[in-house]
Amino acid sequence: MTRIRVRAPKRLSGTVEVPGDKSISHRAALFGAIASGRTEVTGYLEAEDCLNTLKAVRALGVLVTRKGPGHYLVDGAGLFGLREPEQVIDLGNSGTAVRLLMGVLAGQPFWTFLTGDDSLRRRPMGRVGEPLTRMGATVVGREDGSRLPLGVRGARPLKAIAYDSPVASAQVKTALLLAGLWADGPVTVTEPVRSRDHTERMLTGFGARLSVDGRTVTLTPGAELRGQGVAVPGDISSAAFLLVAGTIARGAEITVTGVGVNETRAGLLDALEAMGAPVGRSHGALAAGEPVADLTTRSATLRGALVGGPIIPRLIDEVPVLAVAACMAEGRTRITDAAELRVKESDRIRSIAGELGKLGARITEAPDGLEIEGGARLRGACVQSGGDHRMAMALCVAGLVADGETVVEDTECIRTSYPGFVDTVNALAGTRCVEELP
């Protein structure tokens, strides 16, 4: 277990890049694995979660070759060429990898067993397993197949399904659409609110027959997926920590280049702008079918805001660091409709309220969100990440504007999504204001 010590720097300025998008990296590996021919991926996120996805597709018989940093060749097995793995597949901390892989495995005529770390074994998998079972797959595991370790045995063909998802979840949607590749008819998923659409964009690029009508997505089976070139853009969820730091730290100005700004993922930018942050967007070319931009922000006086409704799925992963921004804003911020945060890597609602509270923030926990009274002066303290990478980095950002020294415990988890986070912040500060401790 490691910890990080944070002290407020005198400045935060500069231009940096962030690692490849985690969601797109997972999909590039999985879609390439079931495509015919070669998929060449550049900008792949070489962090623990996505590296575990590569291990999983290798375990299923797919040849994956590393050509250089973030550069991989995936020689796909096609829809009918995956092989039964010899051992249990361990996905570490990645809920995305497990749920998406379950969709692929639902169409394979063999048993595959999946597990993960302590945190992942607590997360709900029944939201994917239940509809896959209705399609004809067999899913067994703890708590009636709703918790890892899980065993999945697929069927061919799977039954077509029209599924009304109770949650806006790109992971659920993607799992069912992937299973639909082996179905006997169209598979339709309708969500209460539209979730991120990386799957729709990327599967279409690989050759799948998809149609989108508002909150409903339909996949019609029968098309062969073909290997593609995938240039993964920078991860907006990683950029979020730097953008918030650049907004709340005194005298700061930060530019993050090459960031994916898909509208279904860019809710944090809209929320920060609503709070008064001057977020500049310089748009460039598309990458992996996704809009890309250089993002710039600088110190600003923020004001509280109401954040809820359809914007929540567009910024669900960024709520921890958005809460840090709200602590520094003038007035009250209410975050609602975010109960999904309770079943992430940690109960993020409880963790945000409890850990930022240790720094002096005035936060009230609600069943589906948070109420934050801004303007409190943050003071350094010892805080716990709970093994949650986004909590760990959000607490580090809070430490950048707190008086004194902040120590964030259990920070190895940062490696699951942003291994270079500490080095990037120190580069912007021009000093070692963030220091890893044994």
Each language-model region and where it sits:
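Structural preference for solvent-exposed beta-strand-turn elements
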Residues: M1-P438
